[in-house]
Amino acid sequence: MADEKNKPENPDLDQRDINNPRDREALKQAADNFLKARRAEARAEAAADEAEGEVDETANRIAVLEADNTELKDQMLRVAAEMENLRKRTQRDVQDARAYAITNFARDMLSVSDNLRRALDAIPADALEADSNLKSLSEGVEMTERAMLLALERHGVKKLEPEGQKFDPNFHQAMFEVPNPDLPNNTVVQVVQAGYAIGDRVLRPAMVGVSKGGPKVSAENGASTSEDNA
């Protein structure tokens, strides 16, 4: 098969006489044409092999680039998620800074308010009735106390009103217990010192007295149950 492929395909050449100059020239021309054709075929085969190799190389490069692209997308999504979390965290920190910036100052002002209230409570009622100047002074101190608390309220400080509510250790500090069979256990029955909150945080817990001996509160639905059924 290889010999047939490498042999010129013109049957007339077999009839040529190599000793005849014309035939010899024809044979030479045929051989040249055959060699040119074989060279062209060889170049075409080499080009085809090279092209096939380039296709394989291109396919490999595409696969590598697709893998790199997938990895870059994952990295981009992670970075975007981290940036979003950072933005939310920063926004929350800024909001907290604005809401709670006066926390320490407000706590100090509550001590001043407590002193004003103690001064007012220390004045006997009959002394106020007997001395108009003392009464005017007392009213002035009371107005100062109210103005201070209103100013704090404008900045997010609110007074807790726990009396009659269920004791909450996050906002209340129990100082004593009061026996009362008519109220559910751990109901705030008396406020010894007012408590305050700033935003959602406790600024100062309310010092309270709580009831004991009454029906317990069910943890499931908040309904009261008697001591005997507990």
Curated annotation (Swiss-Prot):
Leader peptide range in chain numbering: none
Localization per Swiss-Prot or TrEMBL: Cytoplasm
GO cellular component: cytoplasm
GO molecular function: adenyl-nucleotide exchange factor activity; protein homodimerization activity; protein-folding chaperone binding; unfolded protein binding
A Pfam family hit: GrpE
Keywords: Chaperone, Cytoplasm, Stress response
Compositional bias of kind Polar residues: 221-230
Any one GO BP annotation for this protein: protein folding
InterPro entries (UniProt xref): GrpE, GrpE_coiled_coil, GrpE_head
Sequence segments annotated as region (Disordered): 1-24, 209-230
UniProt xrefs under Gene3D superfamilies: 3.90.20.20, Head domain of nucleotide exchange factor GrpE (2.30.22.10)
UniProt keyword annotation of Transmembrane helix present: no
Complex formation: Homodimer.
Function: Participates actively in the response to hyperosmotic and heat shock by preventing the aggregation of stress-denatured proteins, in association with DnaK and GrpE. It is the nucleotide exchange factor for DnaK and may function as a thermosensor. Unfolded proteins bind initially to DnaJ; upon interaction with the DnaJ-bound protein, DnaK hydrolyzes its bound ATP, resulting in the formation of a stable complex. GrpE releases ADP from DnaK; ATP binding to DnaK triggers the release of the substrate protein, thus completing the reaction cycle.
Alphabetical list of HAMAP family matching this protein: GrpE
Family: Belongs to the GrpE family.
Annotated PANTHER family: GRPE PROTEIN (PTHR21237), GRPE PROTEIN HOMOLOG, MITOCHONDRIAL (PTHR21237:SF23)
Listed name of the protein: Protein GrpE
Source organism (scientific name): Brucella suis (strain ATCC 23445 / NCTC 10510)
Gene that this sequence comes from: grpE
